[in-house]
Amino acid sequence: MALRHDEFYEHAIAAADGDRRLPLSRMTGGDISPFEPDGLRVSPLRPPVLPEPARQGEDPSDCDACGRRGEGIWFDARWRLTRIAGVGVPLVLMLHPRDHYDMADLTDELAAELGVLTTHLVRHIQALPNISRAHVYRIGDGGAHLHIWFFARPEGQSQLYGSWLVVWDDLLPEYPADIADADARIVVDALVASYGGSRAAD
């Protein structure tokens, strides 16, 4: 059984200094970290808060994602794909179920579809010129409606490896939208050809 919230906090705070700051880790000192260790400080570790704040869309009647089920760049009967604007990496796409599900609520059939769709999207993103890898993330702490992130890592940018990619994305200047739109169209055309679906909602 996982540590209770108070046990976890006590375990973590035992490694912190008098200001509740944990030491810098092997990741923050690594060569792919966006931050130089000199002068870098860890934020104080705050005590746990229970109950946790409700996520957006916990009530399906007030779910933003459900209200946008007809918006996107690709659709089939059960899934939709959107492009996230204003990012720093070449392309960020998001896959959503059109109906209200979180990951643990998916039927086995929908879970199988998610696996196949994820594989097709990774193939098509990685086939884009000048893209080395498609990173895939499911977090879910902010929204109760399942959303899967696909980040395209630019070729040759070895500092953007691993889980730091999302931090680099936040630091980088906004990527040209016209290029991202064109690449998103290439991915969607390939997805329609390999998996099905269409550019327009039903």
Per-range role (PLM):
Residues M1-L95, A201-D202:
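Active-site microenvironments that recognize anionic phosphate/pyrophosphate groups
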Residues L93-L117, L171-P176:
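Short histidine-centered catalytic/ligand-binding loop motif
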Residues A112-L128:
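Active-site helix/loop of acyl-thioester processing domains in fatty-acid/polyketide metabolism
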Residues P129-G142:
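A short glycine-rich, hydrophobically flanked beta-strand micro-motif that places a catalytic Asp/Glu
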Residues L146-R153:
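A short beta-strand motif that forms the metal-chelation/ATP-contact edge
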